[in-house]
């Protein structure tokens, strides 16, 4: 048996053993049907009920009280439970060496502060989760079809709200597992069944990491872009090196295989 996810080591062992995950807690913080007689209970209530049940069955040998650190949410101070959910990711682990090479072409001011970036990159071991379950931000331009086995991607360059709009006719339909393009939505829509729009939004840094591309005219003014990119300078604080700077360099490397800036002032 492997305990529920508590840290990176739990995830690593779970994957190494090839175990099949299951979800015992739902998004409302209640136990799922997998908990049997404790289904529907809040987590704290279920823990108390399990102890009472084991005591009734005479299966508790000894109870020892110990102090324990419990992670809580920043604002509500409520206990945090890790729940396994499907999210959208951008691949990044495969390109770390190339980002380091490209960072070598950037002049950092002062030079020693480049180490903030390199230290952060040493700790990257998973891909970048870019989807968030929030109410307000840039919507992820995706719809699900054919009982979730296919995804519909909006064409480049437009803004859509999938939770309230239908896919444009020239959207691409992809197999969800293989990511292979099947065809255009306009031609396939009669065979796709119910269409469900994505309700999740992008991580804020997914937008912010476009800043150097946007100001340089990427995709809109390519003549200007050829002259203006890499952007001359990025001035910023050290506390967002791991987010704003790193994700901007990541996106520049993934899209263009170029350094995002000529100078970085931290």
Segments from the language model and where they lie:
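Residue patterns forming the tRNA-binding/recognition surfaces of aminoacyl-tRNA synthetases
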Residues: 1-148, 244
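Conserved active-site neighborhood of enzyme catalytic/cofactor-binding cores
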Residues: 2-6, 29, 104, 116, ...
């Amino acid at each position: 048996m492997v305990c529920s996810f508590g840290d990176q080591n739990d995830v690593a062992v779970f994957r190494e053993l090839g175990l099949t995950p299951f979800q015992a807690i739902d998004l409302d913080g209640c136990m799922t049907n997998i908990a049997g007689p404790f289904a529907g209970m809040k987590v704290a209530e279920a823990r108390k009920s399990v102890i009472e049940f084991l005591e009734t069955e005479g299966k508790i040998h000894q109870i020892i009280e110990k102090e324990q650190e419990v992670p809580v949410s920043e604002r509500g101070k409520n206990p945090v439970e890790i729940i396994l959910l499907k999210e959208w990711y951008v691949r990044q682990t495969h390109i770390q060496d190339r980002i380091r090479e490209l960072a070598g072409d950037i002049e950092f001011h002062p030079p020693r502060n480049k180490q903030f970036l390199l230290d952060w990159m040493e700790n990257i071991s998973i891909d970048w989760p870019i989807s968030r379950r929030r109410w307000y931000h840039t919507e992820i331009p995706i719809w699900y079809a054919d009982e979730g086995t296919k995804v519909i991607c909006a064409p480049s360059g437009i803004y859509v709200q999938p939770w309230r709009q239908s896919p444009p006719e020239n959207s691409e339909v992809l197999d969800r597992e293989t990511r292979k393009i099947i065809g255009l939505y306009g031609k396939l829509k009669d065979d796709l069944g119910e269409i469900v729009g994505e309700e999740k939004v992008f991580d804020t840094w997914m937008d912010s990491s476009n800043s150097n591309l946007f100001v340089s005219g990427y995709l809109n003014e390519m003549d200007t872009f050829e002259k203006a990119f890499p952007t001359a300078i990025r001035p910023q604080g050290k506390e967002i090196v791991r987010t704003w700077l790193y994700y901007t360099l990541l996106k520049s490397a993934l899209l263009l295989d170029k350094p995002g800036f000529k100078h970085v002032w931290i």
